[in-house]
Design a protein with these regions (language model features):
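Oligomerization/assembly interface segments of phage tail-like spikes and tubes
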Residues: 70-82, 147-153
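N-terminal leader/targeting segments
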Residues: 2, 14-72, 80, 92
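C-terminal basic regulatory modules in eukaryotic proteins
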Residues: 29, 154-158
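Generic serine detector
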Residues: 6, 18-21, 25, 42, ...
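Extracytosolic low-complexity repeat regions of secreted or lipid-anchored proteins
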Residues: 85-154
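Bacterial N-terminal signal peptides that target proteins for export
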Residues: 1-8
Length: 158
């Protein structure tokens, strides 16, 4: 009798653990993406109209991927005029600013690439919020627009 009771308690727990894949749900990832859109629009730096923040894709549409999966994608651009700054100085400043915003304000873990440190043609920033199922990539350009940002959810079952 005791074995039956133990089995009745342990079986649902074992099923719950085995059925959870460890990845976030599509709904949770999509909600976190929308929070990032709001964070970007209300960010102290990027809400300056001179930076010309443009949300090109809001991340509110399901895009089919994989077998029965979906993802959402947010794309945005912003610009900071270079004025008389040297290209390298402009890129250094813009890269540091975007890395700080993504890591400190948005909570992304960034993969730093020291090999592109003095690249005059632009810089790439990659990162993720693993627990939220989000990946970020940003391109820092010497030409307008300075920042090209993309955040997307992993391909998850809806």
């Amino acid at each position: 009798m005791r074995a039956v009771r133990s089995l009745a308690i342990l079986l649902p727990l074992a099923l719950a653990v085995s059925c959870s894949s460890g990845e976030p749900s599509f709904e949770d990832a999509a909600a976190e993406l929308q929070k990032d859109v709001q964070r970007l629009e209300s960010h102290e730096f990027f809400k300056n109209p001179l930076l010309e923040l443009r949300i090109l894709q809001r991340g509110d549409k399901d895009i089919p991927c994989g077998e029965g999966g979906f993802r959402r994608v947010m794309r945005a651009t912003a610009n900071e005029d270079r004025d008389d700054d040297a290209v390298d100085s402009h890129l250094d400043r813009a890269q540091r600013l975007m890395e700080n915003v993504l890591a400190q304000d948005f909570g992304y873990e960034l993969a730093l690439d020291p090999g592109q440190q003095d690249a005059q043609e632009g810089r790439f920033i990659q990162g993720e919020k693993k627990d939220a199922g989000l990946q970020v990539s940003a391109y820092v350009s010497p030409e307008k627009p300075t920042w090209r940002l993309q955040i997307m959810t992993a391909c998850l079952s809806g």
